[in-house]
Amino acid sequence: MNAMGLIFTNDGNLGELTNKRTMASLPFGGRYRQVDFALSNLSCAGIKHIGIISRHSYQSLMNHVGDGEEWGLELEEGGLEFLTPYAHSTIGTYRGKLESINNAMDFLEVGDEEDYVVMVDSAVLCNIDINKVLEAHIASGKDVTVVTKKGVCNGQKKIDLAVAVENGEVTEMMVDYNADEKYVASMDIFVIGKKLLMKSVNILVARDKVHMDRDLVMGGWRRGMISVNVYEYEGVALFNESVEEYFANSLSLIEKEVRADLFGAAHPVYTKVRDRVPTYYGENSEVEDCLVADGCMLDGEVENSILFRQVTVEEGAEVEDCIVMNDTVIEKDAEVKYAILDKNVTVTAGTKLIGSKKSPIYVKRGETV
């Protein structure tokens, strides 16, 4: 397809989970990072010129993605490029997506063979056929296509961009709004002509308008300057925009139907390859309804949990409804329920950590409790 890609790393509202990492580099599903979904969606569509924009704390993201080899992006021309946050900005860091694009104009100008830009965020995880979105965008004749999801708007969750549609046409848009079922939620995936994007960004940023949803899409549509097409996505879409959503969406992967949709064979989700020995299940281990990555040592009881690589659960320990990241050790007779344990955590022998479904306990990286 005649398009280039922009990935926004998004800081989100995940508190300590993203204090020292971007949303894009947040571990998910036992062996992935959230950016893997955006990169895979774009690369599977044949898009080979992709820029990743990040505000800060992007070292772990760069370490994970590297030169993009796993996604077929280690190319002499095009390929993957990290767009640094301070390239041309006089304010130190950008305030919104339009300002970040303004700082990445050189990247857009280099892609003189591409007519369209596909912009995706790393907070919403899905396995979407970007070629179908591009085809629908071109067929619509509209300036911007917004990918949306039904069933997210319920009047209780604040939606970044909520869109009302009747007979295939947009009738209203709201930003940061507790939208009801009348609306569909933007998945933060947009398609726009490259020349129009560059022109719009130049004009809006000069007027101190820096937000994609509010200023370009909704603002342009309300002023009659931008026509908007809506592409309704019918597959699984996981909005990881809070700690509670991240926790619930992670555990939803235990459901076979969710996994089958999110990791469909037609569009694989690629990630950095790490060779590890198989997981060891001791004679006293009991593991039920879990996703377990390679290299774990399991001698205790684990139920309804996600275990990343090289996790140790010692004999007598109980782990239930938990997300346990790489190299974490849960010692003998410890009890951990409804918790997110970051990398290299040690839960000492006999310790009890009991959270709740709506308020999981979080233990930060490297802590001993």
PLM region descriptions:
Residues 1-251, 363:
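Unchanged
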Residues 1-8, 195, 203-369:
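Left-handed beta-helix
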